[in-house]
Design a protein with these regions (language model features):
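Transmembrane-helix bundle of Major Facilitator Superfamily
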Residues: 2-193, 325-329, 336, 340, ...
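Intrinsic disorder in cytosolic terminal tails and internal cytosolic loops
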Residues: 1-17, 201, 444-447, 477-486
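Flexible interhelical linker loops that connect adjacent transmembrane helices
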Residues: 12, 188-216, 258-273, 334, ...
Length: 486
């Protein structure tokens, strides 16, 4: 990876400065991707270590997503107002502290709690890192810079499963968190040493903390209801009451946002057709990606009996393609816009997920890897152009907010995808005759592989419908001329 590549046509002094900025942003994207992907490989191991259920262990992922949803736009706005460098460097330090705490956790509840703290650090890195790169680079090279940032994230994705699997098999799962410490400390040092402060000179503004809390509450209540629904039905007072509370929280959130001087969601941005369609495309595509990423390790370990190391090598297939293709897609988006690229990319993902939904109980390794390669190719073609469209379609002083909204949308889609897949998968197991005790004991799923695979296939077919919606939103997003460079 050569971070200097996007700066080749600029004067040498500016090239060097932008290369250093991009390199530091890439470090931040790398550590977030590394941690996220390594943890996926560890989910079956954590379930066994803490003797807990799928319903509980999914909160190791969900708490991170929900806290990101509630904080990423806020810290993006705070970075816009008070200094992106300050919040970016602080994000690294929080990420390091929380990773250390996760590594020494003794219960599932502790690791869930510390993952919440880790989410705050991840939000500060994600929102402010991409905003720093977007503001620093000229409009003509923003897409390529975003492509390199995306590539760095997926280098972390690529490294995470293999490194995580190796660490789990050799020295234990705790080291998937401890490995973050030297990288995070290095990232904080580089941010403080290399970056200049970047903020917008705007006076008399406030940060929308009520909006952040209400958005997080809306999603949390809805996901909790979805988790309980397979066990007690939607008519149960707990489920129906929680859904009503979620709807009320959503209504209150909209009410607060429309009256806020500095809303967490700038509804005015949704008047921009390109921005809106790109956001919806991102939401639907991340919901399906997260659903499959959540269930796939259990299929590989509990049905096919792969070790964590073997799982890691299989799961990296799509990330390997992304690392190679993402910069090219970003370069193409600078020249031809996002509509065609995002449409093609999301359509390829639909095809790959269809084959994932057709996997048998005795699938060969190549039958698994081939659709993962297709999904990786589609995501690489889709993601960089989509991010460039989102950040390039808004005013300069809204870039941090748009970056936060980008991450929030992806995480909301991801959280909904995990919750929906767990709900559908649990329904499938229950309909096939599994008791609640069996359903909540993933260690027993391997004893009934036919039931597992049938439910897994059905779940993936259903969630693949959301990727089809992403294709449609990519088609209607509008031509490149709608991008508003400020």
């Amino acid at each position: 990876m050569n971070p200097a590549a996007p700066t080749a046509t600029l004067p040498s002094t500016q090239q060097r400065r932008l290369a250093l900025i991009l390199f530091n942003v890439c470090v931040g994207q790398f550590i977030v991707g590394l941690d996220q992907r390594a943890l996926l490989v560890a989910l079956p191991t954590l379930t066994q270590t803490f003797n807990t259920s799928l319903t509980t262990i999914q909160w190791v992922l969900l708490i991170y997503d929900l806290l990101l949803i509630g904080t990423v736009i806020t810290v993006g706005r705070l970075g816009d107002l008070f200094g992106r460098r300050r919040f970016y460097a602080s994000g690294f330090l929080i990420f390091v502290l929380s990773s250390a705490l996760c590594g020494i956790a003794q219960t599932a509840a502790q690791i869930i709690l510390f993952r919440g703290l880790q989410a705050i650090g991840g939000a500060m890195i994600s929102a402010n890192g991409r905003a720093i790169a977007s503001v620093a680079f000229p409009a003509s090279q923003r897409g390529k810079a975003m492509g390199f940032a995306s590539m760095a994230f997926h280098v972390g994705f690529l490294t995470g499963p293999t490194l995580g699997g190796f660490l789990i098999d050799t020295i234990g799962w705790r080291w998937i968190f401890f490995i973050n410490l030297p990288i995070g400390i290095w990232g904080a040092y580089l941010a403080l040493r290399l970056l200049e402060e970047s903020k917008e000179e705007v006076k008399g503004v406030s940060v929308d903390f009520p909006g952040a809390i209400l958005l997080m509450l809306t999603c949390s209540l809805f996901i909790f209801a979805m988790n309980e629904m397979p066990h007690v039905g939607w008519r149960d007072p707990l489920v129906s009451g929680t859904l009503i509370l979620s709807a009320l929280a959503l209504a209150l959130f909209v009410f607060v946002e429309l009256r806020s001087a500095m809303p967490i969601l700038s509804f005015s941005l949704f008047r921009i057709r390109l921005f809106t369609a790109s956001m919806f495309s991102l939401f639907f595509i991340t919901s399906t990606q997260s659903a499959i990423s959540f269930l796939m390790p259990f299929y590989l370990q509990d049905v096919l009996r792969f070790s964590p190391t073997q799982m890691g090598w299989i799961i990296i297939a799509n990330s390997a393609v992304i690392v190679l293709v993402a910069p090219i897609a970003g370069w193409l988006s600078d020249r031809m816009g996002s509509r065609l690229l995002c449409t093609i990319g999301s359509a390829i993902i639909v095809i790959g997920q269809f084959f994932i939904a057709s996997l048998p109980i005795d699938a060969s390794i190549w039958r698994i890897i081939a659709p993962l390669l297709l999904i990786g190719l589609g995501w690489a073609i889709f993601n960089s152009p989509n991010q460039s469209a989102i950040l390039g379609s808004v005013p300069r002083d809204e870039v941090g907010t748009a970056s936060g909204m980008n991450t929030t949308t992806a995480r909301t889609g991801g959280a909904m995808g995990v919750a929906l897949s767990a709900t559908l998968f649990t329904y499938g197991l229950s309909a096939a005759g599994m008791s609640r005790a069996q359903i909540e004991s993933p260690q027993s799923w391997g004893d009934a592989p036919e039931i597992f695979v049938h439910s897994f296939n059905h779940t993936v077919h259903v969630v693949n419908f959301f990727t089809i919606l992403s294709v449609l939103f990519s088609v209607v997003r509008g031509p490149r001329r709608e991008i508003r460079q400020r």
